[in-house]
Amino acid sequence: MDYNRLAELLFPHINTTPEEMEARYPKRELPEGAKVTRMGPSPTGFMHLGNLYGALVDERLAHQSKGVFYLRIEDTDRKREVEGGVQMIIDAFKSFGLPFDEGATTDGETGIYGPYRQSQRAEIYQTFVKSLVQRGMAYPCFCTEEELSAAHEQQEKNKENFGYYGKYAVWRDRPMEDIEAELAKGTPYVVRFRSEGSIEHKIRHEDLVKGKMEVTENDQDVVILKSDGIPTYHFAHVVDDHLMGTTVVVRGEEWLATLPVHLQLFRAMGWKAPKYAHTAQLMKIDPETGGKRKLSKRKDPELALTFYAQEGYPVPAVLEYLMTLLNSNFEEWRRANPDLPMNDFQFTTKKMSGSGALFDIEKLRDVSKNVISRMTAEQVYDYVAEWSAVNDKEFNALLTRDPAFSKAYLAIGRGGKKPRKDLALWSDAKGYMDFMFDELFQPDYTMPERVSAEDAKAILSDFAGMFDENDTPDGFFDKMKQIASAHGYAADTKAYKADLSAYKGAVGDVSMVVRVAVAGRQNAPDLQTVMGILGKDKVLERLSKCADAL
């Protein structure tokens, strides 16, 4: 077989040599130990939590080592591509604050290792496929879908491995005359890699997450170039990761089965393969069966990245929670360093679990409460305003009508060793703040069991006469004690517990009456501070309305 002639028949338009192509992509000048990672999503219109999970690993490995994290759009499967898919990818990662150093952008790309869209790299791939044909390591295959299906059925009947190999690789050694005849007829074809592997052989490999392993050598003549001249993922990622200088490939463990193919292709090209980190799949406890299962696009809305923006999960909280899944020692570090930014944590693949990572949305809410509790009132206000401007315009108008008023309320209990943890989501803010706005105030005047309606009215009347918005919390409580004593309630809880029959109730019951009148509920932040923010007129108005309703 004249392989040079075959290569010219298949690629008459390719005049560039592999050496010339490689010269376009200089070796990266980076510090020793710097890692180059990439995110390579497909523009299918659906960005999921697994994408973010892997991207966080990519970003940390690169930026902790003073390396490069870039975005490459893997759009070789045109059937699955949706309009606007690339924009969705870029917007998703931008919203989660994962900074790419180079790669595809909204209006083009940045960096010297492009194009960063695989659909624009056809000449590059075909240059290297042509070189494989010239070396007798690749060949055209004219099999129809019907012929491939028939072979599959025969393999199933014979209980053989599926695929294109051995006697089923019918175009592997066909003579030039047969190839020329099909080309003359214009028969569509793909280009396959000529594998010299055997399933009898094992390859030793060390994965950054899974550790040392043995995998079966690839014996399949896989397709490397489709009939439209665009490569398959197998070949495209090998060429791109070599030319772009990728040193670590992070991907889901579902890709482990393709590892022998990729290692074989790197060897065939004479290139050093990057290190691979195959991450565990995200699992959850099925509420119906109680067993573990993979997160499902159909069953689990939390798989979609859009879910977190719509529900109002803080971006830092989502990232911190994912880090707890990625590194087993992160929670311990966070407890010891509550005020440090997450990026101060030294992430390592050595602490990643090789088995399924269990996603628990309630645990995410807990992490989110902790993250929000460490924020300033100004930060919380800004985030809630940003979220509500898109998702709850009515609340946004009230929140932003008087920023100082809203921030003053959000500042209650913030700071100190034990900050309040009322908010897990930005969408929780409306329910947390609603009683501060007359437009949302829907009071529940349910009083403590030990307080009669007559006593409640008297307590409210007394408090209205002595209310001072400038009181300290201690000053307010002293007044509660006075009112309690005047109406037969213990001014001291210990005294009440010592002789229950001597009192109607305790001072806590009295202060709860005022809390219910002002806040319209029994659970609210520090009442004296709340009343100071509402102002005297509003407090007296609410005391009066409550008394009238009893």
Report the location of each language-model feature:
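Active-site cores that bind ATP or allylic diphosphates and position pyrophosphate for catalysis
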Residues: 139-278, 283-295, 304, 464-481, ...
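Residue-level signal for inorganic ion chemistry
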Residues: 58, 89, 132, 136, ...
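A generic secondary-structure signal for well-formed alpha-helical elements
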Residues: 18, 93-100, 133-140, 152-155, ...
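Glycine-rich phosphate/pyrophosphate-binding loops
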Residues: 63-77, 235-251, 272-283, 525-543
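Glycine- and acidic
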Residues: 37-44, 70-75, 243-249, 302-305, ...
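Catalytic adenosine-cofactor/nucleotide-binding cores of aminoacyl-tRNA synthetases and other
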Residues: 270-450, 519-550
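N-terminal Rossmann-like or analogous alpha/beta NTP/dinucleotide-binding catalytic cores
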Residues: 2-157, 257-271, 317
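Helix-rich, typically C-terminal accessory recognition domains appended to large enzymatic cores
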Residues: 480-487, 491-534, 538
